[in-house]
Amino acid sequence: MHPGWLSNAYLAWEEGTREGFFVDSGAPLEPLVELVEHEGLTVTALLTTHTHGDHVAGDSELERRFGVRGTQSASWAQAIPTPGHADDHVAFLVDDICFSGDLLFKDAVGGGPDAEVIRASVLKLMELPNDTRVLPGHTDETTIGRERTENPFLRYWFGGEALDEPCRVAGEEATLVVWSPDYDGKGKALVRMTDGHESIVGGSRVER
């Protein structure tokens, strides 16, 4: 995990073929590179959930070392289009593991200007089995089942009560609909502006 961005990079491989792949590159890569060498792996791909800087920072290093470039397509990975946090965002399903990027976190979801787009993307992942492991773009892993029942955003989207608390966002009047913890310690909020538009923003932007 990157000490500042708190972003993850992943290395996974198939035991039989010893072929491995990376997912995102925004964390310190040397421990993963050492693991490639220790396990005698052949790196065949670098999957990119989205092209924000904290997820592609090490792409050039991985290309130099292993000859792989970031891609959102691989025959053995199901790429699930999940826009909202970024227009080019995808989640990857490999066997029973979902690499969710910045869409779904433990207890939170990714931020973005249109909460409805993010909701639709998150609900795509809720079609996966409850025991599916979720490896997010930041901090701790979780499961689909846990987030279905414990994530404040999912509870609201599945019919739970809204907070409906007056607040201000960047100085403008708004209504706080959902509040959750977030990986950066500042919280995450679904807010409704006075024109009815809903977005998901970092907690530091919300005055309660």
Predicted regions located by residue number:
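Active-site metal-binding loops of divalent metal-dependent hydrolases
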Residues: 2, 25-27, 51, 84-86, ...
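Short active-site oxyanion
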Residues: 18-21, 42-47, 131-133
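Active-site metal-binding motif and surrounding structural segment of the metallo-beta-lactamase
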Residues: 29-71
